[in-house]
Every structure is written in structure tokens, then in C-alpha cells.
């Protein structure tokens, strides 16, 4: 239904000028140039709703102008959102989930690694099973966790909790606004605390532990 609409899906629905459904069964394309396909990923039951939205893959769903869901069970919701792998989910304007099972929620959020979760405006995950929660938060290695505005956990199993907190070595933990843990296995607890040596522990506001095993 619509000028130059092209419906190829068995039991499918095609509504909108130049909207099109591929050969997969039960596909739905609604909106100007909305498109479902099974050319790249294959499968049935794709859904694309919105101007130039696109869905390809078994059960893939794209909602919003230029939303793109490419992967089995991928879900993209929001203008220019992208879910580009199996079971990936992207919610929000320009949100992007580009790895298997990844989840991105928030304007410009980006989940780039398998099973990672990025929540918040411009939050980013780049490590497998990592978590970033908060505006501009960043989790850059496997199992890293960053919680808070601008929190940054860039090493394997590192943890940064608090606005501007940073954990930059393997197993390091920084808890508190602007706390920094930059030694392997180090821990910094408290506002602006710093632990910069291996296994160092800094506890309290502005505390500083700069030698190995220091407390």
C-alpha cells in the first residue's frame, strides 16, 4: 500500500511510499522507504517502522527514522539507532549496539563488545561483558565496570564508581567522586583519593597511597 510499495513477504504488511518487504514470511514494513530483508542475515518476521528504517534477520525489529536492526532478534528503537548483531539492542537517538548480545540505552550510547551494557548519554563499552552506566561513562576492557558521570574503567576487571572516577590497571578499584586507582590491584576509596602503586590502598577524602602495598 503506497506509491511504488513492494511487498514480497508471505503474510506480510507493506505500507508507505517505496516501502518494501523481502521474501521472509510475516514481515512488516511501514513508512517511507521502510524495508525488511532476508538477504544478509535471513529469517522471517522482521519489522521495520519509520522513515528509511531497515530490519534484516530472524525476528529483527527497527522502530524510528533510519533505525537499523541487522541480526537475528536484534532490536533498534529510536532515530538512527543501530543494532547490528544477533540479540543486540539499541534504544535512543543514535544509540548503537554492534556486538553479540550487546545493549545500548541512551542518546549516542555505544555498546561495542559481546554482552556489554552501555546506559546513559554517550556511554561506551568496549570490553566483553563490561558495564558503563552514566553520562560519558566508559568501560574499555573485559568485565570492567564504570558507574557515574564520566566514570572510566579501562583495564580488565577494573571498577570505577563515582563521577569522574578512574580505574586504569588490572583489578583496580576507584570508589568516590574523582577517585583514581592506577596501580595493579590498587584500591582508592573516597573523594579525590589516589592509589597509584601495586596493591596500594587509599582510604578517605584526598588520601594518597603511592608505594607498593601502601595503606
Regions from the language model: what does each represent?
Residues 1-215:
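Glycine- and small/polar-enriched repetitive beta-structure motifs of secreted/surface proteins
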Amino acid at each position: 500500500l503506497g506509491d511504488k510499495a513492494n511487498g514480497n513477504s508471505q503474510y506480510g504488511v507493506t505500507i508507505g511510499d517505496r516501502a518494501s518487504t523481502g521474501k521472509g514470511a510475516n514481515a512488516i514494513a511501514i513508512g517511507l522507504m521502510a524495508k525488511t530483508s532476508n538477504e544478509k542475515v535471513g529469517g522471517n518476521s522482521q519489522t521495520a517502522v519509520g522513515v528509511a528504517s531497515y530490519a534484516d534477520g530472524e525476528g529483527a525489529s527497527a522502530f524510528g527514522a533510519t533505525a537499523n536492526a541487522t541480526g537475528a532478534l536484534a532490536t533498534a528503537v529510536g532515530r538512527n539507532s543501530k543494532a547490528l548483531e544477533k540479540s543486540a539492542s539499541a534504544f535512543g537517538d543514535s544509540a548503537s549496539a554492534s556486538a553479540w548480545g550487546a545493549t545500548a540505552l541512551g542518546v549516542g550510547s555505544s555498546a561495542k563488545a559481546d554482552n556489554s551494557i552501555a546506559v546513559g548519554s554517550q556511554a561506551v563499552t568496549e570490553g566483553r561483558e563490561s558495564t558503563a552506566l552514566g553520562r560519558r561513562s566508559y568501560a574499555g576492557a573485559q568485565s570492567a565496570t564504570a558507574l557515574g558521570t564520566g566514570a572510566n574503567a579501562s583495564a580488565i576487571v577494573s571498577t570505577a564508581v563515582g563521577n569522574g572516577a578512574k580505574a586504569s590497571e588490572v583489578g583496580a578499584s576507584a570508589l568516590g567522586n574523582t577517585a583514581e586507582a592506577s596501580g595493579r590491584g590498587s584500591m582508592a576509596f573516597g573523594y579525590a583519593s589516589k592509589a597509584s602503586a601495586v596493591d596500594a590502598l587509599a582510604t578517605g577524602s584526598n588520601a594518597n597511597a603511592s608505594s607498593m602495598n601502601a595503606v
